[in-house]
């Protein structure tokens, strides 16, 4: 009996120790291979992401083709509105007509270098960086965006600790114009000229950027279980864009007069882009974990997903274009020309406006002080003096009143002539 109790106690102890040892081994293996395991090489990760994006794009195109074959398209009927007889009715402008009148052959035209466009983009980015260095507007906007309403409850306030906008500029090259249909699918040579009649033109260009654009933040993880603020874990992250290369597609989407939609500029990147990131992390306050590979993988995957969901085909961004007709309110420059020019006329008109405002202000002051209604004539300002309450009912010019107010009122003699004061 005693031997049976000892054997059962030993078996229970052995089982407990074996279970604890198994848990320790599993936790160690998880930390070693899942958290601190070596991440895949950047080339392998980029190839896997490109394959996934390509399969998603092909699936979207197949679904569009299936939808087209199942639902026949009908030509949209426009409303029969009476047009003005003054405006000439031009021939319908198709894609082939635009290509013919601009002498552009999409099948044989060589790609363009876009050197002039690179200079304009570089000047724009340089001015943007200079404005960012001048004030803290971009820092304030980033802090407000990071601490917006979407911030989870287990995160403390996010502070931006480093911001670098880089020093280099993107290089655009190999620009070509291709015809696409209304869904953005390329119309090849097999489509013929008839297939390009109702499509639109799309410009595609290669873009390459090799720079070091960095954003570093720090925050705290708030562990609120089993009670609020049971533990606080400081976390610091730094994300740097090292290189971006891809193909940018730009096209004009014409507006529809039926529903009142404006003309927009649509742009997106093709699914063959590559984005190389460098992510540094620091977790803890005393015993710190630096550059945890799993954290870098999670953040990099999240950033790629964010970019894919916004401006990688089949998704695209649209910018509403303003009216390109010249307008007076949009005119700038030319104020330093001679007086005989139009700008000189604008300056004289402004001076007349200022003078008129001064006269109006003086008239209101006279009315407030004397209770006399002041009227305006075509030649200047006159006073309409009522007969009641005044001696003689004579009129007094505004310039005399302004001159008398400009001098010392304590030296004015009662009953003296207008404009006459005692020195």
Swiss-Prot record:
Major location (coarse): endoplasmic reticulum
Entry keywords, A to Z: Endoplasmic reticulum, Lipid transport, Lipid-binding, Membrane, Transmembrane, Transmembrane helix, Transport
Biased amino acid composition, Basic and acidic residues: 350-367
Residues in SMP-LTD domain copies: 110-322
Topological domains annotated Cytoplasmic: 37-423
Transmembrane stretches, start-end: 16-36
GO cellular component terms given for this protein: endoplasmic reticulum; endoplasmic reticulum membrane; ERMES complex
Record localization: Endoplasmic reticulum membrane
Topological category with respect to the lipid bilayer: Single-pass type I membrane protein
Pfam families: MMM1 (PF10296)
Domain of life: Eukaryota
Any one GO molecular function term: lipid binding
Region entry Disordered, spans: 327-370, 394-423
GO process terms (BP): aminophospholipid transport; mitochondrial genome maintenance; mitochondrial outer membrane translocase complex assembly; mitochondrion-endoplasmic reticulum membrane tethering; protein insertion into mitochondrial outer membrane
Subunit-structure text: Homodimer. Component of the ER-mitochondria encounter structure (ERMES) or MDM complex, composed of mmm1, mdm10, mdm12 and mdm34. A mmm1 homodimer associates with one molecule of mdm12 on each side in a pairwise head-to-tail manner, and the SMP-LTD domains of mmm1 and mdm12 generate a continuous hydrophobic tunnel for phospholipid trafficking.
Family: Belongs to the MMM1 family.
HAMAP family: Mmm1
Job of this protein: Component of the ERMES/MDM complex, which serves as a molecular tether to connect the endoplasmic reticulum (ER) and mitochondria. Components of this complex are involved in the control of mitochondrial shape and protein biogenesis, and function in nonvesicular lipid trafficking between the ER and mitochondria. The mdm12-mmm1 subcomplex functions in the major beta-barrel assembly pathway that is responsible for biogenesis of all outer membrane beta-barrel proteins, and acts in a late step after the SAM complex.
Free-text note on domains in this protein's UniProt record: The SMP-LTD domain is a barrel-like domain that can bind various types of glycerophospholipids in its interior and mediate their transfer between two adjacent bilayers.
Protein known as: Maintenance of mitochondrial morphology protein 1
């Amino acid at each position: 009996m005693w031997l049976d109790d000892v054997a059962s106690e030993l078996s229970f102890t052995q089982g407990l120790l074996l279970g604890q040892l198994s848990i320790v081994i599993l936790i160690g293996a998880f930390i070693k291979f899942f958290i601190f395991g070596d991440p895949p090489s950047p080339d392998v990760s980029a190839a896997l992401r490109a394959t996934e994006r390509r399969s998603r794009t092909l699936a979207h195109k197949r679904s569009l083709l299936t939808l087209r074959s199942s639902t026949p398209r009908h030509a949209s009927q426009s409303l029969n509105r009476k047009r003005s007889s003054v405006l000439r009715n031009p021939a319908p402008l198709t894609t082939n007509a635009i290509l013919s009148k601009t002498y552009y052959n999409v099948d044989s035209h060589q790609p363009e270098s876009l050197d002039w466009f690179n200079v304009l983009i570089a000047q724009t980015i340089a001015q943007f960086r200079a404005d960012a260095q001048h004030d803290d507007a971009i820092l304030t906007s980033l802090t407000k965006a990071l601490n917006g309403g979407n911030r989870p409850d287990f995160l403390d306030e996010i502070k931006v600790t480093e911001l670098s906008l880089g020093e280099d500029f993107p290089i655009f090259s190999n620009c070509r114009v291709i015809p696409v249909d209304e869904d953005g699918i390329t119309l090849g040579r097999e489509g013929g000229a008839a297939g390009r009649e109702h499509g639109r033109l799309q410009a595609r260009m290669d873009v390459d950027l090799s720079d070091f654009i960095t954003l570093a933040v720090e925050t705290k993880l708030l562990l609120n279980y089993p009670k609020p603020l049971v533990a606080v874990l400081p976390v610091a992250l730094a994300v740097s864009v090292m290189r971006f290369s891809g193909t940018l597609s730009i096209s004009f989407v014409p507006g529809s007069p039926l529903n009142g939609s404006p003309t927009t500029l649509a742009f997106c990147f093709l699914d063959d882009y590559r984005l190389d990131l460098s992510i540094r992390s620091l977790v803890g306050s005393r015993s710190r974990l630096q550059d945890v590979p799993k954290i870098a993988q999670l953040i990099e995957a999240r950033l790629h997903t964010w970019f894919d969901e916004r401006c990688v085909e089949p998704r695209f961004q649209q910018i509403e274009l303003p009216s390109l007709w010249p307008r007076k309110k949009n005119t700038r420059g030319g104020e330093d020309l001679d007086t005989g020019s139009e700008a000189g006329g604008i300056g004289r008109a402004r001076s007349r406006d200022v003078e008129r405002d001064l006269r109006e202000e003086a008239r209101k002051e006279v009315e407030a002080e004397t209770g006399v209604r002041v009227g305006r004539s075509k030649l200047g300002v006159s006073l309409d003096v009522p007969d009641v309450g005044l001696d003689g009912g004579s009129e007094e010019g505004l310039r005399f009143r302004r001159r008398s107010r400009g001098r010392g009122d304590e030296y004015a003699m009662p009953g003296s002539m207008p404009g006459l004061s005692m020195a």
